[in-house]
Every structure is written in C-alpha cells, then in structure tokens.
Design a protein with these regions (language model features):
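C-terminal accessory/tail domains of diverse enzymes
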Residues: 1-166
Length: 169
C-alpha cells in the first residue's frame, strides 16, 4: 500500500494502483447499501416517538414469515415501484402502486411486521414485546396523515418556518 498525493487534496491510500474508495463511498447515504451486510436507511426526520419505529419494522419483517412478504410484493413491477418512489414525496399516501395507494400497502406491511415481532417475542421489563415500537407507524396509518402532511398543515396556518422547526425538533 502506498500514499498518493494529489495537489490540493488529502492524501489517498492506494493498493496495486487502485485508489481506496471504500471510505468515500461509505459516506453516500442511499436508501440501502450493500457491504459485508445490508445497511438500511431509517427515518431521519421524526420525533422521539418514532425513532425506533423504522428498525423495529425491519426486524419484524425479518423475524416474520418472509414468504408472506414475498407473496405480497412478488407481483410488483419494477417500473411501478420506481414511479411510486418518485411520486411519494409529492403525493404521500395517495401515491399509487399496482392499483392501490401506499396507505393500503403500508397497512399490510405493518401487520406483517407486527406478526414477526410477536413471533420473536422479545419482552421488556414490563413484559411487553417490541410491537410497542410500531405504535407511531400505526398512528400514522390510522390518521392517514404523514409527518409531511402535518408540517404542511401547520405551515398553511402559520407560514413561520421557525415555528414549524421548533415543533419538530
């Protein structure tokens, strides 16, 4: 291994003439990254009540019946998934995927995750399982309003971004 020097740049480690890219590439935050493990990006714009919801959701999916998950999503078409991904920031739960809105899919996936956490049956000191971490997601689905919907509603009433920022810290 040797150190390469580029004018105006930090020194770069190189091995066999190849510039080391693993560190710079690890700073890119895509929705998921495949390394020696799969790293999933979780929710990063939520309050304390939802910080554990994302990880608990994924744990529930992995400890649940993966065949049920596969059955639910196996007929999804790649181009429709990409289209829903692109439309979701604007349309939220009204985004369509395979003829159903995202609220429909979110509800079904959340139920599968709950079953997985129930199967895992890891209890806290109060003898409650990890499904309690999904309560925030259940409220979002029950209210049919995303965090973005709530922020837009507050802004349309107040139009003070500082006030909205304080409310969501």
């Amino acid at each position: 291994m040797r150190i390469l020097s580029f004018p105006g740049r930090s020194n770069v480690l190189a091995q066999n003439g190849m510039v080391a890219t693993s560190n710079p590439l690890s700073t890119i935050f895509t929705e998921n990254r495949l390394k020696k493990y799969i790293e999933l990006r979780s929710m990063d714009t939520c309050g304390w009540d939802c910080l554990c919801s994302g990880p608990a959701f994924y744990v529930g999916m992995l400890y649940g019946n993966l065949e049920d998950v596969y059955e639910l999503i196996s007929k999804w078409e790649k181009n429709k998934i990409i289209n829903a991904y692109l439309e979701a920031p604007e349309k939220g739960f009204n985004t369509q995927l395979m003829g159903k809105d995202l609220l429909y899919w979110a509800s079904h996936l959340l139920n599968l995750s709950k079953k997985g956490l129930e199967n895992r049956d890891l209890l806290n000191k109060s003898k409650k399982n990890e499904t309690l971490f999904l309560n925030h997601l259940q409220k979002v689905i029950d209210n049919k309003k995303t965090n973005a919907d709530h922020m837009i509603s507050k802004f349309s009433k107040n139009e003070d971004l500082n006030e909205i920022g304080r409310a969501h810290v």
